[in-house]
């Protein structure tokens, strides 16, 4: 019977596992998806509250032709950002600035973009690359808060090849590299640009993927199931392709038991904790100003890495008359906060908030999400692990997730497209 041997065995039903399983089902393949929790979605989730929507992780995904195709196949309508969310701020000298660089820093950036080779040197950290190509001012005021908001990492430990390699492939200037990448990327001329979501948040996309897999007659999702070992899967389903999409730590555990070459990476590759808090209130954080959010450089006096202004980003995110913000804490430079109690985290948030606004807006509610090991540290050890995967994984086994050459949901989606549609998992 066909059900006995699916085309794919997928371990982990977070965003990555659901995505690979859905792409397989859309191609008419069968999938057995194993998930140790009693629900799918992993880190990503959308919770409806009386005050509005809460996103437990990412608040959106960069649009691409791949996302538009996927949404169309699942019958979903993409939601674009509001015009008023166009402005993005970085905190500088006591206020949110759209352009935090001095005149001299700006000249240095222009010189770097046009005149310095952006080629990444062996073992170079993002910090070293940034200082060399863009100058110290840009690193401190733009690159550090910008990448800190995405990777939550310390730029001095972050591998430039791993974090920036997707954008830089030649010896030319940064401008030349970016132009070359833009030429390669397939575009739909009518494509909506920038960050997008769905009416019910990113959870709507995850629910639709889950429903698609469940509706496939030869596919099945097994919840509350500890992952079977690689050897037992290969024994039971010798013809099935295997996709590990269960996060860095669990993937390493499974790989190490099957292939000794990966054992050393269990100790070397680390993850970071992240805390997100969505706060509902009656007043907008920036008064009459609006925008996407504010990033806080490490020396700006804030404990938060940044804050998203949810009410300005997507329509329908709050109930009438309310406003919502999501503060993000933790990462490499603040590993203690994941150990805090919810009440302590809320106090930290309210103290940070007082530094932004003078208005005394009583909070209506806070929704705290603590991820003790959410994000991989994008360091040289992780780069080596990725290269080892490219070299040593046997045919028919794939290891995927936010540690594979790109941390964001859009990077995972683009890579999944290459693996599933073109069987190009190597970079």
Language-model features, listed with the residues they occupy:
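Active-site/ligand-binding neighborhood in enzyme catalytic cores
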Residues: 111, 118-233, 237
């Amino acid at each position: 019977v066909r059900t006995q041997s699916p085309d794919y065995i997928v371990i982990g039903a977070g965003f990555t596992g659901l995505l690979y399983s859905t792409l397989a089902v859309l191609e008419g393949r069968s999938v057995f998806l194993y998930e140790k929790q009693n629900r799918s979605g992993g880190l990503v989730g959308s919770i409806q509250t009386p005050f509005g929507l809460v996103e437990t992780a990412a608040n959106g995904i960069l649009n691409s032709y791949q996302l538009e195709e996927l949404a169309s196949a699942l019958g979903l309508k993409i939601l674009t950002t509001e015009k008023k969310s166009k402005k993005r701020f970085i905190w500088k000298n006591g206020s949110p600035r759209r352009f935090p660089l001095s005149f001299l820093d700006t000249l240095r950036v222009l010189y770097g973009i046009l005149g310095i080779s952006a080629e990444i040197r062996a073992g170079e950290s993002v910090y070293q690359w940034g200082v060399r190509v863009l100058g110290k001012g840009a690193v401190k005021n733009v690159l550090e808060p910008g990448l800190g908001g995405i990777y939550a990492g310390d730029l001095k430990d972050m591998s430039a090849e791993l974090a920036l390699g997707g954008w830089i492939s030649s010896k030319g200037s940064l401008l030349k590299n970016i132009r070359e990448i833009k030429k390669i990327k397939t575009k739909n001329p009518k494509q909506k640009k920038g960050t997008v979501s769905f009416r019910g948040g990113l959870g709507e996309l995850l629910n639709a993927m889950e429903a698609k897999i469940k509706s496939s007659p030869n596919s099945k999702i097994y919840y509350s199931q500890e992952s079977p070992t690689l050897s037992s899967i290969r024994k039971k389903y010798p013809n099935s392709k295997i996709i590990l999409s269960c996060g860095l730590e669990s993937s390493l555990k499974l790989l190490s038991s099957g292939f000794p070459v990966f054992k050393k990476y269990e100790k070397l590759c680390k993850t970071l904790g992240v805390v997100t808090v969505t706060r509902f209130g009656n007043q907008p954080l920036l008064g009459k100003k609006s925008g996407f959010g504010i990033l806080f450089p490490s020396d700006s006096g804030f404990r938060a890495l940044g804050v998203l202004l949810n009410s300005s980003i997507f329509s329908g995110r709050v109930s009438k008359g309310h406003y919502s913000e999501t503060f993000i804490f933790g990462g490499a430079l603040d590993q203690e906060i994941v150990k805090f109690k919810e009440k302590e985290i809320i106090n930290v948030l309210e103290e940070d908030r007082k530094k932004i606004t003078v208005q005394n807006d009583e909070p209506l509610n806070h929704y705290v999400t603590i991820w003790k090991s959410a994000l991989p540290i994008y360091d040289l050890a992780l780069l080596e692990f990725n290269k080892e995967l490219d070299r040593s994984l046997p045919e028919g086994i794939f290891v995927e997730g936010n540690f594979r050459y790109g941390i964001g949901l859009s990077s995972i989606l683009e890579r999944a497209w290459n693996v599933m549609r073109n069987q190009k998992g190597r970079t």
